[in-house]
């Protein structure tokens, strides 16, 4: 059991660190390369914007004394919860999901700590209908959540095992 916990922890950490590094590298490249609109496909553009809020720009209008502590504390809590959940779940898919979420949280936390806002540069759209801009960290968090939902949707005993382990 202890060996498996160690493997789960390493899986989580390796994915979280990989996502974090990929996110920071792509954001730094975006700052250098995407100062103007770059159309990759008719539905995909790259250009840099700065987001003071969270997903979809939510909370960006809050005053800094409220917004900044909230947006700095939340990812730290997410990192702790995702690591512990991955560690004690006893499941590789959960560890991968939590690593994606944790790495994404860390990438956006880095931006908030050092820039006061998050760098977004990926823009998807169909015609004039745009999805809000995002980055690798945001995509990683979304994929991690989707993977976790799919896992529990298709394997109900997994949730029962997790509850039994915590008792």
Curated annotation (Swiss-Prot):
The entry's localization annotation reads: Cell inner membrane
EC class: hydrolase
Give the residues annotated as active site: 120, 138
Pathway linked to the protein: Protein modification; lipoprotein biosynthesis (signal peptide cleavage)
Keyword set, alphabetical order: Aspartyl protease, Cell inner membrane, Cell membrane, Hydrolase, Membrane, Protease, Transmembrane, Transmembrane helix
Record's GO cellular component, any one? Answer: plasma membrane
Q: Main location per UniProt?
A: membrane
Enzyme Commission identifier(s): 3.4.23.36
GO MF entries? aspartic-type endopeptidase activity; endopeptidase activity
Residue stretches spanning the membrane: 9-29, 68-88, 98-118, 130-150
Q: Catalysed reaction(s)?
A: Release of signal peptides from bacterial membrane prolipoproteins. Hydrolyzes -Xaa-Yaa-Zaa-|-(S,diacylglyceryl)Cys-, in which Xaa is hydrophobic (preferably Leu), and Yaa (Ala or Ser) and Zaa (Gly or Ala) have small, neutral side chains
Tell me which Gene Ontology terms the entry assigns under biological process: proteolysis
Mode of membrane association: Multi-pass membrane protein
Q: What does this protein do?
A: This protein specifically catalyzes the removal of signal peptides from prolipoproteins.
> What family is reported?
Belongs to the peptidase A8 family.
Q: What is this protein called?
A: Lipoprotein signal peptidase
**What is the source species?**
Aquifex aeolicus (strain VF5)
């Amino acid at each position: 059991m202890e060996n498996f916990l160690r493997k789960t922890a390493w899986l989580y950490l390796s994915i979280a660190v990989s996502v974090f590094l990929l996110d920071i590298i792509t954001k730094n490249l975006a700052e250098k390369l995407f100062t103007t609109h770059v159309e990759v496909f008719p539905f995909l553009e790259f250009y840099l914007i700065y987001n003071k809020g969270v997903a979809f720009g939510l909370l960006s209008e809050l005053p800094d004394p409220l917004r900044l502590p909230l947006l700095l504390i939340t990812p730290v809590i997410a990192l702790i919860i995702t690591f512990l959940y991955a560690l004690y779940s006893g499941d590789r898919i959960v560890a991968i999901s939590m690593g994606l979420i944790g790495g994404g949280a860390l990438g956006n936390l880095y931006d908030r700590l050092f820039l006061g806002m998050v760098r977004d540069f990926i823009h998807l759209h169909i015609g004039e209908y745009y999805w809000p801009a995002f980055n690798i960290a945001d995509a990683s968090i979304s994929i991690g959540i989707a993977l976790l939902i799919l896992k529990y949707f298709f394997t109900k005993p997994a949730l029962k095992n997790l509850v039994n382990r915590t008792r």
